[in-house]
From Swiss-Prot:
<dbReference type="GO" id="GO:0005886">
    <property type="term" value="C:plasma membrane"/>
</dbReference>
<feature type="transmembrane region" description="Helical">
    <location>
        <begin position="35"/>
        <end position="55"/>
    </location>
</feature>
<keyword id="KW-0472">Membrane</keyword>
<keyword id="KW-0812">Transmembrane</keyword>
<keyword id="KW-1003">Cell membrane</keyword>
<protein>
    <recommendedName>
        <fullName>Uncharacterized membrane protein YdaK</fullName>
    </recommendedName>
</protein>
<feature type="transmembrane region" description="Helical">
    <location>
        <begin position="93"/>
        <end position="113"/>
    </location>
</feature>
<feature type="transmembrane region" description="Helical">
    <location>
        <begin position="56"/>
        <end position="76"/>
    </location>
</feature>
<feature type="transmembrane region" description="Helical">
    <location>
        <begin position="11"/>
        <end position="31"/>
    </location>
</feature>
<dbReference type="InterPro" id="IPR029787">
    <property type="entry name" value="Nucleotide_cyclase"/>
</dbReference>
<feature type="domain" description="GGDEF">
    <location>
        <begin position="162"/>
        <end position="283"/>
    </location>
</feature>
<keyword id="KW-1133">Transmembrane helix</keyword>
<dbReference type="InterPro" id="IPR043128">
    <property type="entry name" value="Rev_trsase/Diguanyl_cyclase"/>
</dbReference>
<dbReference type="Pfam" id="PF00990">
    <property type="entry name" value="GGDEF"/>
</dbReference>
<dbReference type="InterPro" id="IPR000160">
    <property type="entry name" value="GGDEF_dom"/>
</dbReference>
């Protein structure tokens, strides 16, 4: 957050410098007649290119403008025709060239600092999201917390020889349900699912919502032989759901579970094994 504040100060300073320099340049150019408006239009174009696309584009436009104007000035002087006196034209071209280079640099820095602020904001939002450990709908922990708890459970199993099973429920037709009934009804559905799961497993079992359509449960001190009874109970609790309008819909899930094994060392390995060896039983 300290870095972002420093970048904000830099952005304010560059904007202030740009406004001050542009004001002085406009005052200087206002003394010109017909060419003054054209000079200002091109100058604003260079500044816009720098702010929107970065310093490289602004410098490229500046070099092209200076090259074209220098060529035209030489051409008109050679042809005995001049838009304005040679000495005045050269002075104007030099001043304008310096101003364009300055504006290119300042507008380019504004572009770079703004881009960095956007990246910092994106990172900050991602960090905040990762620190919000509890899903607002179900009250279950999120994916980051799930990995942390699973790692701790693996360590306890290695140290004390405990057994546990990780159970994953993947709801069928989640996207279709949300599209048909809306986000409010979907939140209500998962509030119901969360309540039913709480009544079906022990309080000491750890519940997670790693993604919108998935529920994960760490069944502590549970051998694999007990899983058929657990699945039967869950099937009974999650068989149907009553919509807010009073109608009932059937719920089905893909189910996979994996008991702890000695060859699994990390939570990532455990979850990868769970996905690869998914036993697709339909509740």
């Amino acid at each position: 957050m300290k870095i972002s504040f420093s970048e904000s100060q830099k952005l304010f300073a560059y904007f202030s410098g740009l406004i001050a320099a542009l004001s002085l340049f406009i005052y200087y150019v206002s003394a010109q007649q017909s060419e003054g408006a054209l000079i200002l239009c091109i100058t604003f174009g260079v500044i816009a290119a720098g702010i929107w696309f970065g310093p490289i584009y602004a410098l490229a436009v500046t070099l092209i403008v200076l090259f074209v104007l220098g060529t035209l000035m030489m051409f008109f002087q050679t042809g005995q025709t001049s838009l304005f006196p040679a000495e005045e034209g050269l002075r104007m071209l030099v001043v304008w060239g310096i101003a364009l280079l300055l504006f290119s640099f300042i507008s380019g820095r504004i572009h770079d600092i703004t881009a960095e602020l956007r990246r910092s904001m994106t990172r900050l939002q991602s960090e905040i999201k990762s620190y919000v450990a509890v899903d607002r709908v179900t009250g279950f922990d999120n994916k980051q917390r799930m990995k942390l708890e699973l790692s701790e459970e693996i360590k306890r199993a290695e140290r004390y020889g405990n057994s546990f099973v990780f159970l994953l429920l993947h709801m069928h037709y989640f996207k279709e349900f949300k599209s048909l009934y809306g986000e409010k009804e979907t939140d209500r559905l998962f509030q119901y699912v969360g309540q039913q799961i709480r009544t079906s497993v022990r309080e000491t079992d750890k519940k997670f919502r790693p993604s919108d359509e998935r529920i994960g449960i760490v069944l502590t001190h549970t051998p694999a032989e007990h899983m058929p009874a657990v699945l039967t109970k869950l099937k009974k609790q999650l068989d149907t759901y009553q919509l807010e309008n009073g109608k009932y819909v059937s719920l089905t899930f893909h189910v996979c579970y994996l008991p702890y094994r000695n060859d699994i060392q990390t939570a990532d390995q455990f979850l990868e094994e769970l996905e690869n060896e998914m036993m697709m039983n339909e509740l």
